[in-house]
């Protein structure tokens, strides 16, 4: 009974992997459960919007509960991500924001995270410049206590489904 579930889960993860930029700009494959319809352009960097028609019914539930991020524990165990840090972005996002948001690439000074200071202070509701502001605060005050604080602040975000799309 478990085997078909594991195979199905593995296929959902494998089919929805993307390249992101991590610490120092190093590319890595990020793992996620598929929550959107597969795009014809696999690296299509459109931002997700509220009531986005590309999000599937199951994907909506995964995103509301943040379970679509669960496979990123693999990235953490492989040393590509941390529990706390700026969220990793696609290379095309960095290319698009170069020159538009000053110092956006400075986010790559630390390991990207599953959650971050920007996520507990607005997440999807923040524009890239606002996210960068919070990411820079995190980078400049990075500590074990700050990480613990961010993790504790993440709990109500997950359970209240705040900031989910």
Q: Where are each of the predicted segments found?
A:
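C-terminal terminal-structure detector
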Residues: 103-165
């Amino acid at each position: 009974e478990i085997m078909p579930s594991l195979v199905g889960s593995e296929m959902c993860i494998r089919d929805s992997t993307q390249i992101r930029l991590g610490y120092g700009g190093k590319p890595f494959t990020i793992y996620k459960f598929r929550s959107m319809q597969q795009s014809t352009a696999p690296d299509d960097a459109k931002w997700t919007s509220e009531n986005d028609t590309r999000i599937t019914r199951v994907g909506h539930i995964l995103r509301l509960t943040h379970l679509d991020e669960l496979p990123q524990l693999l990235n953490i165990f492989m040393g590509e991500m941390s529990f706390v840090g700026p969220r990793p972005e696609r290379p095309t996002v960095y290319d698009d924001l170069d020159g538009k948001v000053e110092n956006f690439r400075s986010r790559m000074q630390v390991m990207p995270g599953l959650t971050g200071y920007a996520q507990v202070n607005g997440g999807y509701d923040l524009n890239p410049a606002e996210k960068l502001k919070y990411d820079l605060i995190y980078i400049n005050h990075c500590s074990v206590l700050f990480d613990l604080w961010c993790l504790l602040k993440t709990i109500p975000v997950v359970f209240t489904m705040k900031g989910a799309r």
